[in-house]
């Protein structure tokens, strides 16, 4: 086994990653495979925080007649459903896990308290952050960047459907070029599809590297933590 490159990581998963080929809902086989990969990190002594999107359950569209704020709050509830599903998969493997939500849901999760989250991580517990930032108009990418800064994570592991960052959509263009490394400024200036601009700026301001990789094989989570060059790293350069 290689040497761990990071001590504390923030894993950002899209809600669609949990849906698998169904495109909607939760594929519990996929949730379990992700949980197994996270367990490997915990067994290696790595402290893991996680943020899951909600797009497999709800994709709010203010343009379809719904109030944007209401749609965003519904999305926060969707992320909390995903957080509980991932917690269940992890705990079935014996991984001590806590869900903390930015909106109080005391019957099912702890409220987000930074000091408590840090203490859980130090004790080897996985902490899953639900309900985004608790505020409308902010994405779960921004929530991941914010929580990563607050818990002093060494890196954000950004699991996507593609194996890195490209200059254009590799599913549409055969000549799409993959980047091995990028600076935050390059991502922002070129409008590259990594995180949204708010999240990218937050990572830049706090010098948090973003490691983009494909989740088609959950083993990739361990591989990137061990330093394998299988994705794109976004940093100050």
From Swiss-Prot:
ATP binds at residues 12-15, 55, 59, 166, 169. It is found in: Cytoplasm. Pathway: Pyrimidine metabolism; CTP biosynthesis via de novo pathway; UDP from UMP (UMPK route): step 1/1. This is Uridylate kinase. UMP binds at residues 54, 72, 133-140. GO terms for molecular function: ATP binding; UMP kinase activity. Homohexamer. Signal peptide: none annotated. Belongs to the UMP kinase family. Its main location: cytoplasm. One of its GO terms (cellular component) is cytoplasm. Catalyzes the reversible phosphorylation of UMP to UDP. It catalyses: UMP + ATP = UDP + ADP. Its EC number is 2.7.4.22. The gene is pyrH. InterPro entries: AceGlu_kinase-like_sf (IPR036393), Asp/Glu/Uridylate_kinase (IPR001048), Glu/AcGlu_kinase (IPR001057), Uridylate_kinase (IPR011817), Uridylate_kinase_bac (IPR015963). One of its GO terms (biological process) is 'de novo' CTP biosynthetic process. Allosterically activated by GTP. Inhibited by UTP. Coiled coil: none annotated. It is an enzyme of class 2 (transferase).
């Amino acid at each position: 086994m290689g040497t761990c490159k990071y001590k504390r990581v923030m894993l950002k998963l899209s809600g669609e990653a949990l849906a698998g080929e169904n495109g909607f809902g939760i594929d519990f086989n996929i949730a379990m495979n992700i949980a197994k990969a996270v367990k490997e990190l915990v067994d290696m002594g790595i402290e893991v925080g996680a943020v899951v999107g909600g797009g497999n359950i709800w994709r709010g569209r203010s343009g379809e007649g719904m109030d944007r704020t209401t749609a965003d709050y519904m999305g926060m509830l969707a992320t909390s459903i995903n957080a509980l599903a991932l917690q269940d998969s992890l705990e079935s493997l014996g991984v001590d896990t806590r869900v903390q939500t930015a909106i109080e849901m005391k019957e099912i999760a702890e409220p987000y308290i930074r000091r408590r989250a840090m203490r859980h991580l130090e004790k080897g517990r996985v902490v899953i952050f639900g309900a985004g930032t608790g505020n409308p108009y902010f994405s779960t990418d921004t929530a991941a960047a914010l929580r990563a800064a607050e818990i002093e994570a060494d890196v954000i592991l950004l699991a996507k459907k593609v194996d890195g960052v490209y200059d254009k959509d590799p599913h549409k263009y055969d000549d799409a070029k993959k980047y091995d490394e990028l600076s935050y400024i390059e991502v922002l200036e070129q409008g590259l599809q990594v995180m949204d601009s708010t999240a990218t700026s937050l990572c830049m301001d706090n010098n948090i590297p973003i490691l983009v990789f494909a989740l088609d094989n959950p083993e990739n989570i361990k591989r990137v933590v061990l330093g394998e060059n299988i994705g794109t790293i976004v940093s100050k350069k």
